[in-house]
């Protein structure tokens, strides 16, 4: 099996090396062909490495830097002034071919700006998109993109997002001809703005994308569609609203189960089942948003991710690297454009 290398921004996120380093060690146990480069303050990183000798340590490399992109840094400032930051160096390792993927829990805007400048977009792709999984009633994840990388998109960009989302679903979940839809205010052909309508018309004539039409917001979690495409403004609000509703449901459920002696007694009896249901709704299980459409792989973790959640982001990056996701997107787009122009 070919060895893979992940470049990890060890200082990113709310918890820094306290979370990123132990998660990296766990990833090495799961992926025997994986190597990880930890970028950040060497002294801080070494505090969280195993003290006893471990064979896995031979697959860890540390690149020392004390500069960090903060959550308060504006993207343009980070791009111009944080040239020795752990985030930038991790991305440069991907650009220079020393790592197959970069993982960071740091400033999202800065990561997207740096990634686009350093890694460049694939031929035929105008803008990268941020995509992540959402839980669905079927038990299988649903991909939603864009989640905020592009607050406004024309029809061509939405078309490109549909291609990239379809390929990502095929690569990570090995789903043959995943169902792709555009998020809209109605399912009728006359509904929606010009950009969405025009993107739908293009996709209807693209045989290599299994486009099924428009879906409304209440269809997102049914699992009837595998990939849902929208601009970043709509996608980000949808994602944040969904996370808020999930928190509300958990809060109300816990509150209701503490309401009275008999209810508390019943809750103890059904606690394992309730825990299983809540576990499926836990955003940590879906941690890791991919910035796709670039010449390299970039995965963004939630800033407040714990060790288990950050491990999910590392697993996602390793899977995308094994599947050679950028090459798959490039080849699919070339094939589609060839069909359109023939």
From Swiss-Prot:
Pathway: Lipid metabolism; phospholipid metabolism. Its EC number is 2.3.1.274. GO terms for molecular function: phosphate:acyl-[acyl carrier protein] acyltransferase activity. InterPro entries: FA_synthesis, Phospholipid_synth_PlsX-like. Keywords: Cytoplasm, Lipid biosynthesis, Lipid metabolism, Phospholipid biosynthesis, Phospholipid metabolism, Transferase. It catalyses: a fatty acyl-[ACP] + phosphate = an acyl phosphate + holo-[ACP]. It is found in: Cytoplasm. One of its GO terms (cellular component) is cytoplasm. Signal peptide: none annotated. The keyword Transcription does not apply. The keyword Lipid metabolism applies. Disulfide bonds: none annotated. Pfam families: FA_synthesis (PF02504). One of its GO terms (biological process) is phospholipid biosynthetic process. It comes from the Bacteria. Homodimer. Probably interacts with PlsY. HAMAP family: PlsX. NCBIfam families: plsX. Belongs to the PlsX family. Catalyzes the reversible formation of acyl-phosphate (acyl-PO(4)) from acyl-[acyl-carrier-protein] (acyl-ACP). This enzyme utilizes acyl-ACP as fatty acyl donor, but not acyl-CoA. This is Phosphate acyltransferase. It comes from Shewanella frigidimarina (strain NCIMB 400). The lineage of its organism: Bacteria, Pseudomonadati, Pseudomonadota, Gammaproteobacteria, Alteromonadales.
């Amino acid at each position: 099996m070919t060895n893979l290398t992940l470049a990890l921004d060890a200082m990113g996120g709310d918890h820094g090396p306290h979370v990123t380093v132990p998660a990296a060690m766990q990833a090495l146990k799961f992926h025997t062909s994986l190597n990880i480069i930890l970028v950040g303050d060497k002294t801080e990183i070494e505090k969280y490495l195993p003290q006893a000798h471990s064979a896995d340590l031979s697959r860890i490399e540390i690149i020392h830097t004390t500069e960090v992109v903060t959550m308060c840094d504006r993207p343009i400032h980070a791009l111009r002034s944080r040239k020795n930051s752990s985030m930038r160096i991790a991305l440069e390792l991907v650009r220079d071919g020393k790592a197959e993927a970069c993982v960071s829990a740091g400033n999202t805007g800065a990561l997207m700006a740096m990634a686009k400048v350093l890694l460049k977009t694939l031929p035929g792709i105008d803008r990268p998109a941020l995509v992540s999984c959402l839980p669905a009633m079927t038990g299988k994840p649903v991909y939603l993109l864009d989640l905020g990388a592009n607050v406004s998109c024309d029809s061509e960009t939405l078309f490109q997002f549909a291609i990239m989302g379809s390929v990502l679903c095929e690569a990570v979940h090995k789903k043959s001809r995943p169902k792709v839809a555009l998020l809209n205010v109605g399912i009728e052909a006359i509904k929606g703005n010009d950009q969405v309508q025009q993107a739908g018309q293009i996709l209807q004539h693209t045989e290599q994308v299994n486009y099924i039409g428009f879906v409304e917001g209440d269809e997102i979690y049914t699992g009837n569609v595998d990939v849902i495409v929208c601009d970043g403004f709509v996608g980000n609000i949808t994602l944040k609203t969904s996370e808020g509703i999930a928190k509300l449901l958990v809060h109300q459920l816990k509150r209701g189960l503490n309401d009275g002696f008999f209810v508390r007694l019943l809750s103890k009896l059904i606690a394992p089942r309730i825990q299983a249901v809540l576990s499926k709704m836990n955003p940590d299980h879906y941690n890791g948003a991919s910035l796709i459409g670039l010449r390299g792989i970039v995965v963004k973790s939630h800033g407040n991710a714990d060790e288990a959640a950050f491990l999910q982001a590392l697993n996602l990056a390793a899977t995308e690297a094994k599947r050679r996701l950028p090459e798959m997107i490039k080849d699919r787009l070339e094939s589609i454009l060839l069909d359109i122009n023939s």
